[in-house]
Amino acid sequence: MATPRTSSQERFAQFKLVLLGESFVGKSSLVTRFVKDEFLEQRESTIGAAFLTQTVSLEDNKTVRFEIWDTAGQERYKSLAPMYYRNANCAVVVYDITQASSLERSKAWVKELQHRAADGIIIGLAGNKLDLEDKREVPTEEARAYAEEAGLLFFETSALTGENVLELFTEIARKVPFENSTARPRMSAKGVDLNKNGGTEAQGCNC
Amino acid sequence: MEDGAKDDYIKDIYRHASPNADTDSFLGSPTVAIDSTLSTSNSLSNLNLDTNDSSSSPPAHNDDVPDIAEVLQEMLATTELPSSTTDLDYEPELDLVGGHRRNLGQLNDYGSPRADSFVSLDPPSIGTEVEQFLSKKKQFFILSSAGKPIYTLHGSDDVILGYLGVLQTVVSAYQADESGDNLMSFRAGKTLVVVAVEGPLILAAVSKIGESESQLRAQLDVLYTQILSTLTKNQIHRIYANQSNFDLRNLLQGTDVYLDALTREIVNGSPSILLGALEPLILRKSIREEIDGVLLSCRTPSLLYGLIVSDSKLANVIRPKKHSLHPPDLILLFSMLFNTTSFRDGEHWVPICLPKFNSTGFLYAYIHFFSKSSALIQISADKNAFFELREAKQQILSQMEDKGLIKALERAEERGRFKPVDVAVPMVRHFLYKSRAHVQYVMPSYETHYYEPHMQRGLLTFYHQLHAQVNSDSSRGSNNGWRFMHLVRNSCIGFAWITPSFELYCVSGPNVSRATLAASIHSIAKWVSQHRERLFVIGGAVF
């Protein structure tokens, strides 16, 4: 539910967002640019997942707070992904414009999200590393055509320069219906599915 | 090689019935000194390197095995390599290159792209890269039993693949002779090679800096623990049961930084890894108890362990009555947190196997750095517990803030270790004190005598020697666990005192009498005992 503030027209909503994509396409770098407006030249691979939050202000006095799961791209974490996208309102699937194979991996993620994530999930496709134009392998038009066909928002981004990063997240914030917003953080904490995979515990391997 | 027994190249080949035997049981193991007369080239061909699958090749004759071992360690021990103009004088080396390539042929059959790129280097160049590799004083190799590289400290694939092939062949030759033995270690001059076979993985450490076999074995165990923490023992066994030539690097992708961090610590002489113990944060007893109280009061149902760690030093731990935490697991976890930048921002939810707790399954760690160098770690068996633990974190931090405990932690961290003068033993420059009951160690700061990094490194090397000597087979007598060692060098004197409750290693300047040192060592033990509640995390808070 949207949780409108009491004051006149101000509206506040909180969305859960998950980042998916192959390893080394720059998911963590995109989030770091969005959340802290920083870029680390040497970044270590994410293991498991990192959880971050960031707020964006929209027109009409709307404020959106993102709760972001920045997931690890490695194959060994694949089986954990449903845990992160299960309750997500929106997702950013990232590929690297200099690696054609990473777009193929993105398509698989999109398919999985469309089949298994919540209905109405807003998916953005981000072709990252736009600053490496001279090494481009994925033509913009090809990716855009795919995105349109699959019903995705589409941006080419550069976490290094910051190009289109805020635009990507802002556009997603505009597209997610306010009614779909998760309730207050405290409530959402309880809302995480504790039953679906209950009892797997230490056996819940991520092979 | 007739005078091999006097020669540096004489080898002791240790063979052992149990692959996991600890050093204690080493006492009874047979030691075979081999005097080899075969040339290295012969020994290579004896090993059937050119068959398609050396691991399934017929068992090598026992008589030949030592020669292969000799070849391998000669390769590892050699620092001077033939220049290209003297190739003919170094036939054995050239033949090794041949072995190299044949072995690569196998790897190639398994479809490794890296092997592909290597084969095109024909012949493999013996140049500066190899020289650099061979000049390293310390090496670690992790490979699969099919000879596939998993991790190496030094050397690119081009350089190491041949060595790994030989190593794998030697190890499998021992396994193939039906005695159920595994190769444990061998020595060439000052170079010691220690091998650990862990299921489908082979780990090897090569040291030219005088570490003991048990020290190197402990180091290998730390690296193996890291690999298990990512994949679990079950997964590794399952993977190789399905596909014996699997390239494990695919699955370990991204974890090199953690293995690198551990090997860096090992190479730097980490006292924590030497002693297999944690360093606690020195904290007033009342502060530690207050923090324990906060952690306990905010505990949620899914919590298994809760820890607060400052700059790799354990400040607090809460745990269930039934379970204790295992220092090797924590050494690993702390190294991941504090020797890399991965976790510095935000909150993290990480599946991790703590192998000494349970090597077959995953736990989930909630990790959050609440200051520049202090982290809260909450470990749960429930993979869906993130938000529950996140909420607990918010309560823990706000309570700690209210009670001034975060500031107290910061102050403790700033104060750091105690100073040698605090202990009032003026002749002692530095010491390591390990409480065996708590599996924790304390030491004074390096300042005064060891402010330069190279001095610290020298000190730690000396501790390794002292530790090796006092824990060597010959000094492990009956004495009910009491041992004593006095080691005199030109520049310093070392003193080790092992009792059932503690291990104490101390270093003084030269020309200090034994009596003075003995008195000092008693003072240290007494001082530590008096301050134990401030120095150590005693048991942690139990729920």
From Swiss-Prot, chain B:
Say which domain of life the source belongs to: Eukaryota
Concerning Pfam families, the annotation shows:
Fuz_longin_1, Fuz_longin_2, Fuz_longin_3
* Predominant location: membrane
Keyword Membrane on entry: yes
Record's subcellular location: Endosome, Multivesicular body membrane; Prevacuolar compartment membrane; Vacuole membrane
The UniProt entry lists membrane topology as: Peripheral membrane protein
Is ATP-binding given among the entry's keywords?
Answer: no
Q: Which family does it belong to?
A: Belongs to the MON1/SAND family.
What is the role of this chain? In complex with YALI0F03861p/CCZ1, is required for multiple vacuole delivery pathways including the cytoplasm to vacuole transport (Cvt), autophagy, pexophagy and endocytosis. The MON1-CCZ1 complex acts at the fusion of vesicles with the vacuole, through its regulation of the SNARE complex during the coordinated priming and docking stages of fusion, and particularly at the stage of tethering/docking.
- Its recorded name reads Vacuolar fusion protein MON1
Recorded source organism is: Yarrowia lipolytica (strain CLIB 122 / E 150)
Give the encoding gene's name.
MON1
